[in-house]
Design a protein with these regions (language model features):
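C-terminal motif of bacterial Sec signal peptides marking the signal peptidase cleavage site
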Residues: 14-15
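Beta-propeller blade termini and top-face loops
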Residues: 19-631
Length: 631
């Protein structure tokens, strides 16, 4: 086996001739008119699986029993439903940027909607703010915002719909911004990276609340002219890990009692740092919950996976009977975090972390109970990783056409959109028990094409397509846009289909975790029979690392019994079709330079003696000759 290393110096390649490149770059309009319109594409689906969604709004304050909804997928753009989420339609999936992170509606004109792009806590750069004046039929870019990388939150002033506030961050134009002309021009009213903003109407004046990343809560009682730090400190430097407690924050104020507000903060590790409450419009704040890494305190699991962290009583046992350190990687409050207040009751507070939690006692210590479960098929199931909660505009009112008091709430997460019609019912104080949760949810994702595929494979006969999704498992296509079946859960990653036998498929979970599937499809009913087992246990991950989060593997295109994968070493199996998955063996072909893992592997389709491997962040590419002959 011969290895040739090719080093690409990105500074030279991309740095040279920048002016010539920029001047010759095709415009969005030219690309749209020349290539996209001349190519016919059909949406294969899945139409029954939703993807990561960080924003949702409900049109207007009507008394209709059926809501018109708008949802922003982080891939896919803005979708609209006119039947309460039973079906969805993409409004404009050819916008220059479809990474929608936040939505806001003009309170005086339902046809005017703002969409902020760029996902600060997901890694996708945006292109500022887009606006529609015809309920989503057409969208235009607000030009003076186009250099904003991450638009984290947009709020239209409740006093004057000409005034808009935007919390923004990133290397481009960043800060807490204000527009007084419906988004035509923008002014920074606070320069720190801003990740959330809330606005309360107090006697005709906008009280503005912003959360500055790592620095904490800022408050203005004069429409943003002057700000005061209320929680945290202006002296903390961005990404200062010596004082890592004020990482991400979320703000919520009560609709029924506007003087009441809450602040949720996670630390740099993604754990709950604290919850604060104000009862005087933000003049004073009291910390009601303090996690502070003390495992004896309650509520330590609010922003974490309750199956993997200390339970509500701090006794060190996780839900599956084992013990685990509180600093577990499943603490991810910097990725999924939200706080909101019941519109009819200022004491009822919802928190979204990996799961949903609710306090009926004004966020007092020990008062948060579990309100959903991310596994199983019970009525309390909601997909993991919560991002947003929106209540019906008529929440808490008696609805003659609805059949009682409106308790509808919509929840967005990594699985799309869910709705509950009884969101005020029972919760449980035990994070490891869910049978007593009374809140029931329904998944509403038909037509909501917002999934994020990491990788996919097509069978040689074109009959099957298998793909790995972000947090939605591995899906198998077998006939139509509605005929997609999940064959593995969690995060889906790389996939392959045996070119000689399309009923044999391979999928992977995060890191090096490869499975072999034997698939049988009933041609009459479309039912799937899926027998699977892991085949990567023979790879040494303790010495050579667990690989990349989304780790590559590849079948040899000229030998369907041979597979390659990589961590800090390159591995080959010559018997991936062994009678038992436990009999699959692996050979170490050698290590890469440094501590980088293989990121991508490809083999020449006509010559298995030529392989290329892209490695880590070092811009190194390995050309490997005769990999089947090594080591």
């Amino acid at each position: 086996m011969k290895i040739i290393i090719i080093l690409l110096v990105f500074g030279l390649i991309f740095g040279c001739a920048k002016e010539e490149y920029d001047s010759a770059a095709p415009t969005y309009e030219s690309l749209y008119n020349s290539s996209v319109t001349k190519t016919n594409w059909t949406h294969m689906g899945p139409l029954n699986v939703g993807g990561r969604t960080r924003s949702l709004l409900i049109q207007g304050d009507s008394a209709s029993s059926i809501h018109t909804l708008y949802a922003g997928g982080v891939t896919g753009g803005v979708f609209k439903s006119t039947d309460g989420g039973e079906s969805w339609k993409a409004l404009n999936d050819l916008m220059p940027n479809i990474n929608v992170n936040t939505l806001a509606q003009d309170p005086k004109n339902n046809n005017v909607i703002y969409a902020g792009t760029g996902e600060r806590y997901g890694g996708f750069r945006g292109a500022g703010i887009f606006k529609t004046e015809d309920a989503g039929a057409n969208w235009t870019s607000l030009d003076n915002s186009s250099d904003i990388w991450f638009v984290n939150k947009i709020v239209v002033s409740p006093n004057n719909s000409d005034v808009i506030y935007a919390a923004t961050s990133g290397i481009g134009s960043a800060g807490l911004k204000k527009s007084v002309d419906k988004g035509i021009t923008w002014t920074n009213i606070h320069s720190d990276y801003s990740v959330d903003v809330a606005v309360v109407n107090k006697d005709g004046t906008d009280y503005v609340y912003g959360y500055s990343e790592w620095k904490g809560l800022i408050v203005s009682f004069d429409g943003g002219a002057n700000f005061t730090h209320k929680v945290g400190s202006s002296s903390i430097l961005l990404y200062d890990y010596t004082t890592p407690n004020y990482s991400r924050g979320s703000i919520a104020f009560s609709k029924s009692t506007p003087s009441r507000g809450y602040l949720l903060v996670s630390n740099a590790a993604g754990q709950l740092y604290g919850i604060w409450k104000t009862s005087d419009y933000g003049a004073n704040w009291t910390k009601t919950i303090s996690q502070d890494n003390d495992t004896t305190k309650t509520d330590s699991w609010l922003l974490s996976d309750s199956t993997d962290v200390f339970d509500h009583n701090g006794n060190g046992k996780n839900c599956f009977g084992g013990t685990i350190d509180l600093n577990d990687l499943r603490s991810q409050g910097n990725y999924d975090q939200y706080i909101t207040v019941d519109p009819a009751d200022a004491d009822v507070v919802w928190v979204g972390g990996i799961e949903l939690f609710r306090s009926d006692s004004a966020a007092a210590s020990g008062s948060f109970n579990k309100a959903s479960v991310w596994y199983g098929s019970e009525g309390s199931y909601v997909h993991a990783d919560q991002h947003y909660i929106a209540f019906s505009p008529t929440y808490g009112r008696d609805m003659p056409g609805y059949g009682g008091t409106d308790k509808r709430a919509y929840f967005t997460n990594d699985g799309g959109v869910f709705v509950s019609t009884n969101s005020k019912t029972g919760t449980t104080a035990n994070p490891c028990e869910y049978s007593s949760i009374g809140v029931e949810y329904k998944e509403i994702v038909k037509g909501y094409g917002t999934t994020q595929y990491y990788h996919g494979a097509v069978s040689k006969d074109g009959k099957y397509v298998v793909g790995g999704l972000q947090d939605q498992g591995v899906t198998l296509y077998h006939g139509s846009s509605d005929n997609w079946t999940t064959i593995a859960g969690g995060d889906g990653a790389y996939n392959a289909i045996d070119p000689d036998n399309s009923s044999i498929m391979y999928s992977s979970y995060i890191y090096i975790s490869i499975r072999r599937h034997n698939i049988t499809v009933d041609n009459e009913t479309g039912a799937i029979s899926n027998s699977s087992g892991g085949i990567s246990s023979g790879i040494d991950t303790s010495t050579y690392g667990k690989g990349s989060f989304i780790n590559p593997f590849i079948l040899d295109p000229n030998n369907s019994s041979r597979m390659y994968t990589a961590n800090k070493a390159l591995w080959r199996s010559d018997n991936v079709k062994a009678a038992s998955t436990s009999d699959v063996t692996w050979t170490n072909l050698g290590t890469f330079d440094g501590s980088n893992s293989g990121f991508e592997i490809t083999i020449a389709p006509s010559n298995s003696k030529v392989m290329y491997v892209g490695v880590g962040y070092s811009a190194s590419f390995y050309r490997i000759l005769n990999p089947a002959d090594g080591p």
